[in-house]
Amino acid sequence: MKRIVSGDQVKVISGNEAGKVGVVRKVLYSSVGRRKEVYVIVSDVNVRRFVKKTQAGKKFDAKSYPIAVSNVALLAGDGFVSKVGFKLKDGTKKRIFKRTAEFV
């Protein structure tokens, strides 16, 4: 089970976008040799805007770029950043906030 999944509300903790809050839209996994990397695409964070030329004129477009999962942290229900742990509940593994000990 993964610590951050799509649909989670996260806060960017480092980089140019530090302090911004958004919802994870997609989790991307890539491997280069033996190194495995995990990236997330967060809505309204790390967005680049550009102009496309069309026959009708100019069209403004925006694209979200991935952020390394180590640069984001999960937001707990009280609005503060929390680490994620795991507990067994009814025989299944569930994620919990370590800060509040509540289930995600």
From Swiss-Prot:
Enumerate the Gene3D superfamilies for this protein.
2.30.30.30
> GO CC terms on record?
ribonucleoprotein complex; ribosome
Instruction: Alphabetically list the UniProt keywords.
Output: Ribonucleoprotein, Ribosomal protein, RNA-binding, rRNA-binding
Gene Ontology molecular function, alphabetical? rRNA binding; structural constituent of ribosome
The record, for InterPro entries, names: Rib_uL2_dom2, Ribosomal_uL24, Ribosomal_uL24_CS, Ribosomal_uL24_KOW, Translation_prot_SH3-like_sf
User: Short name of one Pfam family for this protein?
Assistant: ribosomal_L24
GO BP terms: namely:
translation
User: Is Chloroplast found in the keyword set?
Assistant: no
Name the residues that span the membrane.
Answer: none
**Chain's role:** One of two assembly initiator proteins, it binds directly to the 5'-end of the 23S rRNA, where it nucleates assembly of the 50S subunit. One of the proteins that surrounds the polypeptide exit tunnel on the outside of the subunit.
What PANTHER family would the database entry show? MITOCHONDRIAL RIBOSOMAL PROTEIN L24
- State the family named in the UniProt similarity comment for this chain: Belongs to the universal ribosomal protein uL24 family.
How is this protein organized at the quaternary level?
Answer: Part of the 50S ribosomal subunit.
> By what name is this protein known?
Large ribosomal subunit protein uL24
